[in-house]
């Protein structure tokens, strides 16, 4: 099938921002002006098209990255029609996984900043993630109509706090309630958008006299930035003192794609000003799939291969999101890097080794969809009903296998017990949690062996709140949730030898199992090891796996406080048996008894998870932040200067970190942010351990 849009005219972009920068309203306006959306959805009244999960509408924050396709030919229809695929990304610290996975499949991004709040902590986190994937960016300073709006101040913060090189290509005309439009520094014209057409129409006027000097100054800086793109442009600029308009755009484009500059624009999405020109900038300065480096992967013969953005190459795509849809069931969102795929084709999942037949293919527009017959290089689409695909899997041509670089997903750090409010909902709850875990690799579900409770684990308190909320809304399962729990472990501090004997001989066939174990502590992270040193058949070899099994089950159930026993070596070195009464069950129980008694005598201790915490804080709050970390039993490992103040690195027990996000926010007026990941297990202090053991008895 012929392409409707040449791949050179594709733009795969993300809209990334801090929570309140106005990202969803900006995306809404994009959909409106590109003719997809005919009613303006406002976050304020919770009707935004992109935010298609009910909860997002309630909380006013964007959680899932919905993928949307739209078309644009420029404000004045000055470009041939381009196809823009937009991925909306969340801006909350608990959803960094969503941001990671969308950045992984984007070619460029528009970073939205609030003209009043400027660069917020979360902007720094998202910016770092975009640096990791080398994503070219534009900056859109939104909310120019708000009190306290200051475009150039925010541009300064992008330079100082994010270490980027922003180049204004517009200057605002007025600010706050007097914000009227923008000056286009390339054409040197003032742009005013028409209120009655909701900004669909605009007119170009002369630059207001009071802005002329400022516009000349920033135009000069912009042209210098463009001239640095190549020797040829620099020579022309030095000879003529000027550059033609086409060369300015060409130079800015080259440097943006190389990640050397960030063109900066401004507007007010809410007031329908500026988004139209920002869309023009997406066409002018963001890359097409052909302009980003080919994607690399591992081929069937273990050598490195790559795929170029071409329909002629073998098919290769990355599944970046799984979502369940109330109408069509399972949706797998994927980005096509090379080749063509038609519905009815078979693909190979290089991660799992399974083959999948492709049924329906959908082009998504936030919450409506259009069925399509095939997808091509550069497309972002969704497949319906794929069975065994998870986030990060590679789908490829079965005859040309390649495994694209996987996304890295963090380990969950917090868990809660969850149970349905009514017994009849148990099965529905299991199905719901299973589906949610497939959608989100940073969310895990397991059953606690001893209590039979269902335990869910995730990246933070808000993350788990939202999971429980989605169960209620999408699966109609009401659940009770326990308090957040820390994943403690148990181990021993000294070696010991211990006998375990299980004898039942009262009429009929009895039970007889008898073992001697040596238990020894192992280094951290070694786990459980079983060694068989039986000589002379004192324990027949058919019963030895049963001893191991009995010990293993006991390690999972814990000894002193019900937490798994780790880093321990159990050596079976002696025992005895009975010709008739010995059985696997008897030896399993004997092994378990010996292990349990031995651990109790071998100076058992409780281990607690220690988190690596990194806090980025303005210097004036450093003392407060460090004092607070010390109160939380934290050990400060080091400090360094950062673009936005100080970075404090510390190791803190997870048990002390609950509620930290809220405390840090209030202690620093929301200006500090932190990241936290698991580091290691350390012995818990005796007063802490004592309280936990007592609670478990």
From Swiss-Prot:
Residues 8-290 form the tr-type G domain. One of its GO terms (cellular component) is cytoplasm. Keywords: Cytoplasm, Elongation factor, GTP-binding, Nucleotide-binding, Protein biosynthesis. GTP binds at residues 17-24, 88-92, 142-145. It holds the Pfam family GTP_EFTU_D2. It is found in: Cytoplasm. It comes from the Bacteria. One of its GO terms (biological process) is ribosome disassembly. PROSITE patterns: G_TR_1, G_TR_2. The keyword GTP-binding applies. One of its GO terms (molecular function) is guanosine tetraphosphate binding. The keyword Nucleotide-binding applies. CDD domains: EF-G (cd01886), EFG_III (cd16262), EFG_mtEFG1_IV (cd01434), EFG_mtEFG_C (cd03713), EFG_mtEFG_II (cd04088). Belongs to the TRAFAC class translation factor GTPase superfamily. Classic translation factor GTPase family. EF-G/EF-2 subfamily. Catalyzes the GTP-dependent ribosomal translocation step during translation elongation. During this step, the ribosome changes from the pre-translocational (PRE) to the post-translocational (POST) state as the newly formed A-site-bound peptidyl-tRNA and P-site-bound deacylated tRNA move to the P and E sites, respectively. Catalyzes the coordinated movement of the two tRNA molecules, the mRNA and conformational changes in the ribosome. This is Elongation factor G. It comes from Nitrosococcus oceani (strain ATCC 19707 / BCRC 17464 / JCM 30415 / NCIMB 11848 / C-107).
């Amino acid at each position: 099938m012929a392409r409707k849009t040449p791949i050179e005219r594709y733009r795969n972009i993300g809209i990334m921002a801090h929570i309140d920068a106005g990202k969803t309203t900006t995306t809404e306006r994009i959909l409106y002006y590109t003719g997809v959306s005919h009613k303006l959805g406002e976050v304020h009244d919770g009707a935004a098209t992109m935010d298609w999960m009910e909860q997002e509408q309630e909380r006013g924050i964007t959680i899932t990255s919905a993928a949307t396709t739209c078309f644009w030919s420029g404000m004045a229809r000055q470009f041939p029609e381009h196809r823009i695929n937009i991925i909306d990304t969340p801006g909350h610290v608990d959803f960094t996984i969503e941001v990671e996975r969308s950045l992984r499949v984007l070619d460029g991004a528009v970073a939205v900043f609030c003209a009043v709040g400027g660069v917020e902590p979360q902007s720094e986190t998202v910016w770092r993630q975009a640096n990791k994937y080398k994503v070219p960016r534009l900056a859109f300073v939104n909310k120019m109509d708000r009190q306290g709006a200051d475009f150039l101040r925010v541009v300064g913060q992008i330079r100082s706090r994010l270490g980027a090189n922003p180049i204004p290509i517009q200057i605002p005309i007025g600010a706050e309630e007097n914000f009227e439009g923008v000056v286009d520094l390339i054409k040197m014209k003032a742009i005013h958008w028409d209120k009655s057409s909701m900004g669909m129409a605009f007119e170009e006027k002369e630059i207001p006299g009071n802005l002329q000097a400022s516009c000349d100054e920033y135009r000069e800086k912009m042209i210098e930035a463009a001239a640095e793109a190549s020797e040829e442009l620099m020579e022309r600029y030095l000879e003529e003192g000027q550059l033609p308009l086409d060369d300015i755009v060409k130079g800015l484009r080259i440097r943006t794609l190389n990640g050397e500059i960030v063109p900066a624009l401004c507007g007010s999405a809410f007031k329908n000003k500026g988004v139209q020109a920002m869309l023009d900038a997406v066409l002018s300065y963001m890359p097409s799939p052909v302009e980003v480096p080919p994607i690399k992967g591992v081929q069937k013969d273990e050598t490195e291969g790559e795929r170029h953005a071409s329909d002629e190459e073998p098919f290769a795509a990355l599944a970046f999101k799984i979502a369940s849809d109330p109408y069509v069931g399972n949706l797998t969102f994927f980005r096509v890097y090379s080749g063509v795929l038609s519905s009815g084709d078979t693909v190979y999942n290089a991660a799992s080794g399974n083959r999948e037949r492709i049924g329906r293919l959908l082009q998504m527009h936030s919450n409506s969809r259009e069925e399509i017959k095939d997808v091509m290089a550069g497309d972002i689409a969704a497949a319906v009903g794929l069975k065994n695909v998870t986030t990060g899997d590679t789908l490829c041509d079965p005859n040309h296998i390649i495994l694209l670089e996987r996304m890295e997903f963090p380990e969950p750090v917090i868990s809660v017990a969850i149970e349905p409010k009514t017994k009849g909902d148990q099965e529905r709850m299991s199905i719901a949690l299973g589906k949610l875990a497939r959608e989100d690799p940073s969310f895990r579900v397991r059953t606690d062996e001893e209590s039979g409770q269902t335990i869910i684990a995730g990246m933070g308190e808000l993350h788990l709140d939202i999971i429980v909320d989605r169960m209620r809304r999408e699966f109609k399962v009401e659940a009770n949730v326990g308090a957040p729990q820390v994943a403690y472990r148990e181990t021993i501090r000294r070696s010991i030898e211990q006998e375990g004997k299980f004898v039942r001989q009262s009429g009929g066939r009895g039970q007889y199992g008898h073992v001697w174990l040596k238990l020894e502590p192992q280094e951290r992270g070694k786990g459980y090891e079983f060694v068989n040193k039986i000589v002379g058949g004192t324990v027949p070899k058919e019963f030895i796996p049963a001893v191991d099994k009995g010990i293993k089950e006991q390690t999972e159930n814990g000894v002193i406080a019900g937490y798994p026993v780790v880093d321990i070596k159990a050596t079976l070195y002696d025992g005895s048996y009975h010709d008739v009464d010995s059985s696997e069950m008897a030896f399993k129980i004997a092994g378990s008894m010996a292990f349990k008694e031995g651990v109790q005598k071998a100076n058992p201790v409780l281990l607690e998870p220690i988190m690596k915490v990194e806090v980025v804080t303005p210097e004036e709050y450093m003392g407060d932040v460090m004092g607070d970390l010390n109160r939380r039993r934290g050990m400060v490992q080091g400090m360094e200067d950062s673009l936005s103040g100080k970075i404090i690195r510390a190791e803190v027990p997870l048990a002390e970190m609950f509620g930290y996000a809220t405390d840090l926010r209030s202690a620093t007026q929301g200006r500090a942010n932190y990241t936290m990941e698991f580091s290691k297990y350390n012995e818990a202090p005796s007063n802490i351990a004592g309280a936990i053991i007592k609670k478990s008895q």
